[in-house]
Amino acid sequence: MVFVAMRVKYQFGSLKSVHAVVYGLFIFDPSGGDTMKICRANALRLWEEYFGNSQFAEDFHGNLMCRDGYGDDDFYVYRFGKRIYCGWNIHHILPLSCGGTNEKHNLICTNIYTNDEAEDKITYWIDDCLYQVQRVYGTGEHQIIKIN
């Protein structure tokens, strides 16, 4: 099984006004982070960055995703005579409610089931696997760790 750990940079503290400049579909803020509006076009760009032209990929839990199934929770394929739901969407590694952002480094493609199970928690079970979002020691970055 291939496990992809994503990292995110974030900042706690008081809110500051941010003046953003829009370049194409991505929004870049003056602090150096790049924020991504979550929409189909940007989701497909993110897919291409991580998976290239592949039609199918697995998320961090191993659930199947199909490029054509973005945003469709009823999208499925048949594999070995079994219906497999492979719709996908964008998951925030560090949830927005916990200080996460829409920076590309905080976003990952996941099967809709995976995203629904993770919700906006930093510790969560998916099937019989326990995951936790943990800060990388000495940095402001975060990653998803499989605990068991």
Language model region names:
Residues 69-110, 118-122:
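Histidine-centered nuclease catalytic patch
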Residues 99-105, 116-148:
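Polybasic, low-complexity binding patches
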